[in-house]
Swiss-Prot record:
Any one GO BP annotation for this protein: translation
Gene: rpsP
Protein's name according to its UniProt entry: Small ribosomal subunit protein bS16
HAMAP family: Ribosomal_bS16
Region described as Disordered: 81-115
PANTHER family: 30S RIBOSOMAL PROTEIN S16, SMALL RIBOSOMAL SUBUNIT PROTEIN BS16M
NCBIfam families given in the database record: S16
Organism per entry: Gluconobacter oxydans (strain 621H) (Gluconobacter suboxydans)
Amino acid sequence: MSLKIRLARAGAKKRPYYHIVVADSRSPRDGRFIEKVGSYNPMLPADHADRIRLVDERIKHWLSNGALATDRVARFLGNAGLAPKPTYNEQPKKSAPKAKAQERAKAAADAAAAA
């Protein structure tokens, strides 16, 4: 049984509220779970104390028993200091325009300056 620490959607339409739960990875998003270990209310301001609530002791227990956090929950745990912050690959840099495109852009700029 593969365990995940993930978000389970609750709340009303257009008013999201999430429970942070430990669940079998095969169960539905809002379906059966093993234990509720926190909550996330995205409707509250970012600096509000109750926006993200975590039960540290139980999360540490489940992580030590092999549960894996999903991307969003891993970010929450990293910010709370319960797990290392996830690393993200840097986006590749946009390639510079080729020579013909640079010549065309320069010609257009010269024409606009002359006019």
